[in-house]
Amino acid sequence: MAASCGGRVVVFPFPFQGHFNPVMRLARALHARGVGITVFHTAGARAPDPADYPADYRFVPVPVEVAPELMASEDIAAIVTALNAACEAPFRDRLSALLSAADGEAGEAGGRVRCVLTDVSWDAVLSAARGLGVPALGVMTASAATFRVYMAYRTLVDKGYLPVREERKDDAVAELPPYRVKDLLRHETCDLEEFADLLGRVIAAARLSSGLIFHTFPFIEAGTLGEIRDDMSVPVYAVAPLNKLVPAATASLHGEVQADRGCLRWLDAQRARSVLYVSFGSMAAMDPHEFVELAWGLADAGRPFVWVVRPNLIRGFESGALPDGVEDRVRGRGVVVSWAPQEEVLAHPAVGGFFTHCGWNSTVEAVSEGVPMICHPRHGDQYGNARYVCHVWKVGTEVAGDQLERGEIKAAIDRLMGGSEEGEGIRKRMNELKIAADKGIDESAGSDLTNLVHLINSY
């Protein structure tokens, strides 16, 4: 454990599961190195459970009220903008109260506040902390390459790369190799100008932060991290994989679906590297037709699988029953769960492939466990992640087409797991990447984490 100089870090995760988990995992890594933690969190259904965390954590609810119908929508730009607008004043009030308590009764407050550590999506939080004279560190839970897209987004819109047009989708983006136009970050469900404005605010707040922390492998994204460091002129740290740097621990929000651990017992009875794990994360959704195609693609492939069908995965339906005829085809070789302990599933020796939406957390976890991927990005940064996985690192294969189709699904599974030369090459490269990731934990990520603790203790 690193020596602590006393005081605490105020940690404020963004209330989406894919953002929340890495920030809380990072907080646990800092805590293990002697840093006191106070968690600010949105109140209500998206609050963390204190029982899941060390006894000396402190939890401070921040009332953030956004219309439920907006939160239930897929308009990411509007949701994030509304959350920031609703959060700024109550966050400032609670941080001010904590600062006053720390000045008056350090025992009650747990020591003085050294800094705020928050998701870069909370641009209002970064600005409010700075306004109160508190150093603020931003955490990027996506890749460094995605942050580089954030930085260039307004230019990409102004130059006509976005919105994506059919006739240009395969064109190279000269300003951002290795991206093609169709790989660029985007959300079809929100207004492009509003999204560009949001990213502009995120970058502006990040430039004025006291430092940026990326959940990424330093050895994979070294060049991109260097470009960001030079352009932003703030300290930059890379800490990944957090699932290897920090002991396994629960990090979840009230109201999230609990993981079904029964699938692990089922995996125990399967042959090594024979099972395909299928999960599209905590937010991606698909149309009912695609769900049917995916079910039949898995059935037709004839390979054992664990499939996560979470509530609200299928647009317009709260849950998903297998289509008629599929259950009989997959009985005994397919397990469907509402949620899975993903890190443990990917680490299981029976798992030989991961059919994924290519969210960044899932990508990091797959690389850290050496599990090759079948990629079908759905929105946001997933297109760019798939570009790196399949065409730069070459540790995965893509399902052809914009919509899931059973024949293309079966073909992708056969390419990866059917003993082909392509599949063997993918597995070999993924194993090499895993070895490099394991080596980099101590050499790079661990040292960046140590340097981050030193920075925090210097405040």
Curated annotation (Swiss-Prot):
Catalytic reaction equation(s): DIMBOA + UDP-alpha-D-glucose = DIMBOA beta-D-glucoside + UDP + H(+); DIBOA + UDP-alpha-D-glucose = DIBOA beta-D-glucoside + UDP + H(+)
Gene3D superfamilies on file: Glycogen Phosphorylase B
Pfam families the record matches: UDPGT
Active site: H19, D119
Residues bound to an anthocyanidin: H19, G380
GO cellular component: cytoplasm
PANTHER family from the UniProt entry: GLUCOSYL/GLUCURONOSYL TRANSFERASES, UDP-GLYCOSYLTRANSFERASE 76F1-RELATED
Protein name: DIMBOA UDP-glucosyltransferase BX8
